[in-house]
Amino acid sequence: MHQRILILDYGSQVTQLIARRVREAGVYSEIHPGDVDDAFIREQAAQGLKGVILSGSHASAYEEGSMRVPAAVFELGLPVLGICYGMQAMALQLGGKVSFSDHREFGYAEIVAQGGTKLLSGLADFQNDAGQDVLKVWMSHGDKVTELPPGFSLMASTPSCPIAAMADESRGYYAVQFHPEVTHTVQGKALFSRFVREICGCEGDWNMPDYISEAVARIREQVGNDEVILGLSGGVDSSVAAALIHRAIGDQLTCVFVDHGLLRLNEGLQVMQTFSENMGVKIIHVDATEQFMGKLAGVADPEAKRKIIGREFVEVFQTEAGKLQGAKWLAQGTIYPDVIESAGAKTGKAAAIKSHHNVGGLPETLNLQLLEPLRELFKDEVRELGVALGLPPQMVYRHPFPGPGLGVRILGEVKHEYAELLRRADAIFIEELRNTKDPASDLSWYDLTSQAFAVFLPVKSVGVMGDGRTYEYVVALRAVQTFDFMTADWAPLPHPLLAKVSSRIINEVRGINRVVYDVSSKPPATIEWE
């Protein structure tokens, strides 16, 4: 059993980043709601728990009815790290005082370290004129600790937040008002590594080779000799799930690959070559293009299109699953963020939560047990696992693609003609992004963007080609850069790259005579157009 760190979530939108930072230090971590009972905490302690981290929150710690830290957290003798709200809750429960700050801090701040604590000693971005260590951090708080609890000492301060960090090293309690989990805090990774490795004493036994061995053993034990069916979309999550399950049980796995006619150029062929021909996975390839296109005819509303595509996929999958009489398990590519978001939606703890199609996705009428081998992993870990399992890096590290496919990248009604034009234009855009390197970083512009794609606009514009007038369609190019997809900036692609993409699309894709580039950030725009 792995050593583990328990993260108690009080509603912060970046709690998942805490878990990722801990895992980057080679230590397994799990997120659970902040109001779990004492029995749960003690149960965790009996399963290799080495420390606890208390997350931030959008709520105020001193308001009546605010969430409190389970008492057992402070009774087990384990190291505890409080972050923002977690610091304030710790202070209140251990005898300190918290008040609303006259000067709310949001954004970059510079904190001055006080004394040599285990957590912050030597973690400096620079030294000030007085020779004190200074860290560049990210603040986001309205409340602040105004009086230290008994036994605590000051660890760091800012002019507007005199108690920016505190510690009771005799008990292993540490708390910071800033957010070390976000990339803006320069020493954030080092801080988490020091807490989990040096203070909690974790050895760093969380790694991908061991995970593969353990996951294969779990799948074999769970499934036995039963048959498993999996809906293979060609996306990263379902592809990695298929590769992992196939390694565990071989021909007991059957994948159903539904081609709805809205995939990227040659995507169906690539999926079949990778899994069926190269890996020997049993795949049922269903070309349901006409069925989907027929149902989408005349439908322009984006949400209606999504629902139709989702409904038809379930119908096709159910039909194929019904033909496999021996199947007893339904495998899905559910990953850890899906599980966290689903739990948050049920408890209502998070401020902004989306539902996910994988969690409880397909109807219970299939009467199949659920197999989710990736449910402990974050996306970056899923990609690492995919490479370790032998999947092509281009498949594993490809940009996100919406479940409804090109159906939501064709504005308005979906038609065969529109899908074919968009497929070819999009392929040219992606090809040129892969082939063009940024001299400063030596990375391709595909790697420097988080998501890039073409959008089909169902309007025509006047153009001139040769000596003749044209009246043809328009495509928009969209490329964004983001850390978390909650906010995003449009990517500053080089003008020569955009010029080449535009020229190729207009010359090679008959039916398109104008290319535009989307320079909208999120917010106010969303990444996808529909």
Swiss-Prot record:
- What InterPro entries does UniProt report for this protein, alphabetically? Class_I_gatase-like, GATASE, GMP_synth_C, GMP_synth_GATase, GMP_synthase, GMPS_ATP_PPase_dom, NAD/GMP_synthase, Rossmann-like_a/b/a_fold
- Its GO CC terms? cytosol
Q: Where does ATP bind?
A: 233-239
Give the first-level EC class, as a single word. Answer: ligase
Specify the protein name: GMP synthase [glutamine-hydrolyzing]
Pfam families for the chain: GATase, GMP_synt_C, NAD_synthase
The Swiss-Prot or TrEMBL record annotates one GO molecular function as:
ATP binding
Catalytic reaction(s) noted: XMP + L-glutamine + ATP + H2O = GMP + L-glutamate + AMP + diphosphate + 2 H(+)
Question: What sequence ranges are listed for the domain Glutamine amidotransferase type-1?
Answer: 4-205
Pathway(s) this gene product operates in, as recorded in its UniProt entry: Purine metabolism; GMP biosynthesis; GMP from XMP (L-Gln route): step 1/1
Q: Which UniProt keywords apply?
A: ATP-binding, Glutamine amidotransferase, GMP biosynthesis, Ligase, Nucleotide-binding, Purine biosynthesis
The domain of life for this entry's organism is Bacteria
Q: What does this protein do?
A: Catalyzes the synthesis of GMP from XMP.
Catalytic site positions? 84 (nucleophile), 179, 181
Q: Which HAMAP family match?
A: GMP_synthase
UniProt gene name:
guaA
Q: What EC number(s) does its UniProt record assign?
A: 6.3.5.2
Q: What are the residue boundaries of the GMPS ATP-PPase domain, all occurrences included?
A: 206-398
Recorded source organism is Bordetella avium (strain 197N)
Q: How does it assemble?
A: Homodimer.
Q: List the disulfide bonds.
A: none
